[in-house]
Amino acid sequence: HTTSAPPVLAGLSADVCLHGHLSAGTAAVECALEGIPTLLIDREGCPDSKFYELPEGKVIFKNWLDAIDALMEHFKAPQGIPGFGDWSEIIGEFDPFRDGKAANRIGTYLHWLIQGYEKGLNRDVIMADAAQRYSKNWGNDKVISINSV
């Protein structure tokens, strides 16, 4: 069954969210951004994933059995396990604004790109202009420059 409802909608009605992949963590990131305790199961074995900066055994698990065992311990503990499902160590790297306006920012950025192409500008000029405008509106620290060789 599929739905057009965002994953965070289900997350908001849950005590803890579980995400079964590291290869596609967007649903987990959405839930963690909302402050919902979110667990990750690394079924594929991706030790180089950014997610391994999160505490193993509290947020990231190598298999479902370990995650479910920890989840049961968390629910049995009167105050839960401290730091369980807590992404606060890295969540700011995924959305430094945390204001719910990411769609507006990316939409504006894409609009600037489209405007540049409609004007017939060179790709590099379009990209540089959009980056400069984004910097001016939302901060230079939010723009990453990757120079091609």
Regions found by a protein language model. Name each.
Residues V16, H21-R98:
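Catalytic binding pocket for nucleotide-activated donors in carbohydrate/polymer assembly enzymes
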Residues P7-A14:
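Short alpha-helical donor nucleotide-sugar binding micro-motif in glycosyltransferases
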Residues L65, D69-V149:
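C-terminal amphipathic helix plus adjacent low-complexity
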Residues H1-S4:
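Nucleotide-activated donor-binding/catalytic signature segment of Leloir-type glycosyltransferases, i.e.
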